[in-house]
Regions:
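Non-heme di-metal
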Residues: 1-180
Length: 180
């Protein structure tokens, strides 16, 4: 069903390592409003969806969220690549480093591992679409918060792209709710 292209949807080219920022952005990988949860939510909701057009949107957006997950992992990798222990020590990333070194393990910024309980799938299309609208808004808010905390233009460029895509996803789901 999927075709994998060996390039990201949007380029990730981080020049400066920053373990503190990596520890914040990790939340969009495995946090309650992150990309893994979004992709799992939409790709599982499609199985109980009675409308082909909505199933197509859930599949499209869920697939795109997998790509966003890859982009977040690339940001984390580039922010932590070749860090010294001195650069890590004393940052919030140090606790993460103990368990995962610099891998992209799905956790929230608080350190809580990803949990499928974040994924809302009820089997009622209106309930699920309203869950999706809320999920996209929460993801956008999280990206807004990251932008408030980040002073890295390379990171901010990618985060702004991802934030914009959350708005597009919200609009696509809203169109389906409004069309009945």
């Amino acid at each position: 069903m999927w075709f994998y292209e060996k390039q990201l949807q949007y380029p990730v080219k981080i020049k400066n390592p920053n373990p503190k920022l990596a520890g914040i952005i990790i939340s969009q990988l495995g946090g309650p409003d992150g990309e893994i949860g979004a992709s799992m939510r939409y790709l599982h909701q499609r199985y109980s969806c009675p409308y082909d057009k909505v199933t197509g949107i859930l599949t499209d957006v869920g697939s795109e969220e997998l790509g966003h997950m890859e982009m977040i992992a690339a940001i984390i990798h580039q922010l932590t690549k070749n860090l010294t222990l001195e650069e890590i020590d004393g940052t919030p990333f140090a606790a993460y480093f103990v368990d995962h070194t610099t891998s992209a393990y799905p956790v929230a910024a608080s350190g809580v591992p990803f949990d499928m309980k974040y994924v809302g799938v009820k089997g009622d299309i209106l309930t699920d679409l309203n869950e999706d609208l809320a999920a996209e808004q929460k993801a956008r808010t999280t990206y807004d918060n990251i932008l408030r905390l980040s002073d890295d233009p390379d990171v901010n460029d990618v985060i702004k792209f991802l934030r914009a895509r959350e708005i597009v996803h919200y609009q696509r789901f809203a169109e389906r709710v409004q069309s009945g």
